[in-house]
A protein has these predicted regions:
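Beta-propeller blade repeat segments, especially FG-GAP/WD-type strand-to-loop junctions
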Residues: 9-27, 62-77, 116-135, 173-189
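Calcium-coordinating acidic loop motifs
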Residues: 17-19, 45-52, 69-70, 98-105, ...
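Hydrophobic/aromatic beta-strand segments within beta-rich folds
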Residues: 24, 54, 74, 107, ...
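Repeat-based blade/solenoid architectures
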Residues: 30-43, 81-96, 138-153, 235-248, ...
Length: 268
């Protein structure tokens, strides 16, 4: 499916139906995600660990966090969750999800600022309550004002924990692009590498785009976390499988206790 973020007009959510009458149906209004703010970016993730994808919308002005209630309705809970950031002139340019502290709940990094509006970037820690806490300083990230264009999470040093890369939009007038290494112990994380067999082997696409990964408690058989390989945010690592070297999508779960089982469902 495809979510399109617009400026000064309704956003659109296109459901991929793969039908004879046309592959996509616009359902943004029907599911209450046709936000009309000045949109900057959207970021999908299952922040509440209920097995479906929610979406954070970065805006000029008030941000939105749409909780997915079973695929039939989205509810904007940004204010209650503490991530609305609706102050005068506030500009959020991008957002990225990762469980940086390995507690089993996804955290949210917001890249902020613009041409004439320098602002601090923010890291919000998720928890069981669903209310995010500002952990920018406690995580060791700078709280100075800047203007960031984007941010992304990936394990660049291969130590098992997600690291953060933030891009600066003002060249010599700003701090430059920044790479923050996550020093938390790898035993708090579980890494899953996912790769499709490809169309020549009648399998899923090699990049595993669309694959659904569930982390399951081995004792209770309950799903405790869910992630999906998405095209814009998929992290890729080179691996060898069955004598063939190629790219695989990397999914990192915060896994503070175990044991766990992992279920992977490929598209198609």
């Amino acid at each position: 499916d495809l979510y399109v973020v617009n400026r000064d007009q309704e956003n659109a959510l296109y459901r991929n139906d793969l039908s004879d009458s046309g592959p996509f149906t616009e359902i943004g209004c029907a599911l209450s995600v046709a936000n009309t703010q000045i949109g900057q970016a959207g970021a999908w993730a299952d922040y509440d660990n209920d097995g479906d994808l929610d979406v954070f919308l970065a805006n000029v002005g008030a941000n939105a966090l749409y909780r997915n209630d079973g695929g039939t309705e989205f509810v904007n809970i940004a204010a209650d969750a503490g991530v609305r950031q609706s102050g005068s002139g506030w500009l959020t340019t991008a957002a990225g999800w990762a469980d940086y502290n390995g507690d089993g709940y996804l955290d949210l990094y917001l890249a902020s600022g613009g041409d004439e509006q320098f602002q601090p970037d923010l890291l919000f820690a998720g928890n069981v309550s669903g209310i995010f806490a500002d952990s920018t300083s406690s995580a060791g990230l700078p709280t100075s004002v800047t203007a960031q264009l984007s941010a992304g999470w990936a394990d660049f040093d291969n130590n098992g924990s997600p690291d953060l890369y933030a891009t600066n939009g003002f060249g010599p007038f700003g701090p430059g692009n920044r790479l923050f290494r996550n020093n938390r112990s790898a035993d708090r994380f579980l890494r899953v590498l996912v790769r499709g067999k490809g169309p020549t082997a009648n399998g899923a696409n090699l990049a595993a785009i669309g694959a659904q990964i569930r982390l399951i408690d081995a004792a209770s058989n309950d799903t405790v976390a869910y992630q999906q390989v998405l095209p814009r945010t998929a992290r890729v690592r080179t691996v060898e499988s069955e004598g063939v070297t190629g790219a695989a999508a990397e999914i990192i779960f915060g896994a503070p206790a175990g044991p766990y089982n992992v279920q992977v469902k490929f598209p198609g």
